Curated annotation (Swiss-Prot):
Domain PH: from-to ranges: 455-561
Organism annotation: Homo sapiens
Record entry for activity regulation: Both the ABR and the SH3 domains contribute to maintaining the protein in an inhibited conformation by associating with the C-terminal tail. Binding of these domains to the C-terminal tail inhibits the activity of the protein by blocking a region that is required for its GEF activity.
Function as written in the Swiss-Prot or TrEMBL entry: Acts as a guanine nucleotide exchange factor (GEF) for RHOA, RAC1 and CDC42 GTPases. Regulates cell migration and adhesion assembly and disassembly through a RAC1, PI3K, RHOA and AKT1-dependent mechanism. Increases both RAC1 and CDC42 activity, but decreases the amount of active RHOA. Required for MMP9 up-regulation via the JNK signaling pathway in colorectal tumor cells. Involved in tumor angiogenesis and may play a role in intestinal adenoma formation and tumor progression.
Protein's name according to its UniProt entry: Spermatogenesis-associated protein 13
Amino acid sequence: MTSASPEDQNAPVGCPKGARRRRPISVIGGVSLYGTNQTEELDNLLTQPASRPPMPAHQVPPYKAVSARFRPFTFSQSTPIGLDRVGRRRQMRASNVSSDGGTEPSALVDDNGSEEDFSYEDLCQASPRYLQPGGEQLAINELISDGNVVCAEALWDHVTMDDQELGFKAGDVIQVLEASNKDWWWGRSEDKEAWFPASFVRLRVNQEELSENSSSTPSEEQDEEASQSRHRHCENKQQMRTNVIREIMDTERVYIKHLRDICEGYIRQCRKHTGMFTVAQLATIFGNIEDIYKFQRKFLKDLEKQYNKEEPHLSEIGSCFLQNQEGFAIYSEYCNNHPGACLELANLMKQGKYRHFFEACRLLQQMIDIAIDGFLLTPVQKICKYPLQLAELLKYTTQEHGDYSNIKAAYEAMKNVACLINERKRKLESIDKIARWQVSIVGWEGLDILDRSSELIHSGELTKITKQGKSQQRTFFLFDHQLVSCKKDLLRRDMLYYKGRLDMDEMELVDLGDGRDKDCNLSVKNAFKLVSRTTDEVYLFCAKKQEDKARWLQACADERRRVQEDKEMGMEISENQKKLAMLNAQKAGHGKSKGYNRCPVAPPHQGLHPIHQRHITMPTSVPQQQVFGLAEPKRKSSLFWHTFNRLTPFRK
């Protein structure tokens, strides 16, 4: 019997014999630069579901999925400095003869036969299995095949109108039932099973314990099997806390490695090629990621000081988060900038020289096999993971533990930071939809809607009563700070004409009971009014049903509350982001069809709904939203129709 080789002894836990992991693994997934036989093992574990709808074909929202690796190209003059030195180190696979006569891959060696040095060897060896390439999917399916309940926590909201997709909110617990695809997993939440984007969730470290928050209700037989499995694999509370502490430390070290690769591998090379990148372009693409790298290095040092290597469950790391909670505010700027960075990168990637350049940067830095947009997404994901990690750590920290109070305070602090950033991201995504909506409105007058507003709160039809007692049926859109009034086209009910707006900052909402209103001297039903604080002018509105009126009253109250919250949190959208959203919407509106006599026809209006303010996946199978209107008031016949019949080119 042959003894284990040094390479086998140094192999990380969870890896096949001899398959030594050379590089750390990203928290955003991906594949290793070096070969692995885990793919075959994963395929053997996967079971085909009995009957499930097809997997969604669109890209994962709100950010596109991590791009596939660019194929090698012939490098041009834009090749980063130093790439020629990569070829001097000939990377070879040294083969070890196993006991069964086969060959197994071992460590990489250079030309002189010595092993390459790398700073994260200990990290790779000590990392949990889910940090290994393909290890997360493999670990999930192993647990599922063994009858365990696998739970994941949502990082972001996922709102969808597709029945084939699972909707949830940040912090919700999802039971994972299948993870055969790296982008889409099959899971259960609130008694519903459907597909959901894998990048939206964080796999729980301690999967042995069935989540108390899980809304799934397994049968008695499944419950008995899960109970036996928990008794078989469950560890004590100290071990559970150890698992969470190790996850925080391991992922933090890997995260620092990715930030270093971005700063040294991409930014440094870009600055050397002034002919390809301007200072403004680099600021747009990378934002303040160098400041984040500097901050995270200090934060990791603080964590290392508090980390008890011998007994990790005794580590007291809560104070590290509390001492640095103000520093985490720099993530807000980065997350605000990230959508613009994606647009700038997408424009550059249309040119081959930029694709070659960024791939060459990755190879020169010996980074893992993920495109640049995947690396730039890591800070956005990281700041959303902290509250989930701290929540799980708090769960396994007893009140008698010396770190309990600090962990509890740190959890609340990081949750507030993540909520603020999530809200900013949601608003940034909504302004594009609002800009496209404005472009679709015919005859828009005055300032752009984005000059004052960034969120649609409610919309619907109301009857406006004028001073003369006339009723006007209008479609109203309530944004933060303003209420926009539109009129439907007589022929095309999906086309809207701009009719005016009210400044909600100057209005006072008054609920009216059914009966005669003294201001207008009219009998009204399901009515409310807005009174100007400066001019005392009264605007009277009537809803079709009492339920509609109640929704409008609640929406007006929500509008005032959100405006106040945005003011307290300093929630502002930059002028550049607003201008960019309007510019993109106007470009998208060009080239539309023209009506009779070369009169431009506005694009069909698609009513915005408050649900659209979050991450929306709109499948093609969902029909266009129907608009149910109130009855049009009768009008006298007009000469217009007689003239129209003579001019129209269409004949029966």
